[in-house]
Amino acid sequence: MSRSQNLRHNVINQVIDDMARGHIPSPLPSQSALAEMYNISRTTVRHILSHLRECGVLTQVGNDYVIARKPDHDDGFACTTASMSEQNKVFEQAFFTMINQRQLRPGETFSELQLARAAGVSPVVVREYLLKFGRYNLIHSEKRGQWSMKQFDQSYAEQLFELREMLETHSLQHFLNLPDHDPRWLQAKTMLERHRLLRDNIGNSFRMFSQLDRDFHSLLLSAADNIFFDQSLEIISVIFHFHYQWDESDLKQRNIIAVDEHMTILSALICRSDLDATLALRNHLNSAKQSMIRSINENTRYAH
């Protein structure tokens, strides 16, 4: 089976699981929204919709897809036989999606087998991935095969942002010095357009920001061409968006502000304005830091 088929089958299994849990509304979100939710292309989304329609799970009504019946496991595919490295990538995507869609919450316990079935990967892959995150005090091993999500305090958030500021300001300087022919300049323009599209439709799509945020910071850090920076982004993204799901009281407004801040950074970057880009990035990081600290303090107050 090709890698694209493995990805498609695993995402189909994940969509089926999300439908069964009631995490996906009917009619379904737009194809572009689904692509953002699952970090896949719209071509893959169309293949998934076609499969679920043929199975009788979905019915097309005009341009919308409506859930015709509750899906079951027979509508999906057997667990992937992809290589371990491919399964790692599949689970990383699935883990991030679970956090973004509030399927994993602070204080909840879950099993390696439960996550492996949801993502369609080997439990060994899940265990290795969770052990890596365990070192950052994001999750805690309760007993063999069982884990729980942890809460962290203001000191943890400040340390996280200290690392983030060092990595991203360093990467920004590298980006500003990229040669004109580097493909990342075109990617920056595309990224700016993606932000414009989300801003124009943010009323119903503000939850889609987390994947866009991850892509934005990934592009920025890529300019450093440092594998350790890329690995740090993985941890930071999960912690940052996992924590933000706890307090949804002003999530929409926070995301609107962050989209505007990203656009200011990208515009200055594309214009090669070193000072404006640096100031915009520092402002964005400080804004995000203060927002997270407020959220932590609110959660601490309610906990008591």
From Swiss-Prot:
Name of the protein described by the UniProt record: Probable HTH-type transcriptional regulator LgoR
Entry's Gene Ontology BP terms: galactonate catabolic process; regulation of DNA-templated transcription
InterPro entries from the UniProt entry: GntR_C, TF_FadR/GntR_C, Tscrpt_reg_HTH_GntR, WH-like_DNA-bd_sf, WH_DNA-bd_sf
UniProt keywords, alphabetically: Activator, DNA-binding, Transcription, Transcription regulation
Gene: lgoR
Keyword DNA-binding: yes
Function statement: May be a positive transcriptional regulator for lgoD and/or lgoT. Is essential for growth on L-galactonate as the sole carbon source.
Keyword Transcription regulation: yes
Species of provenance: Escherichia coli (strain K12)
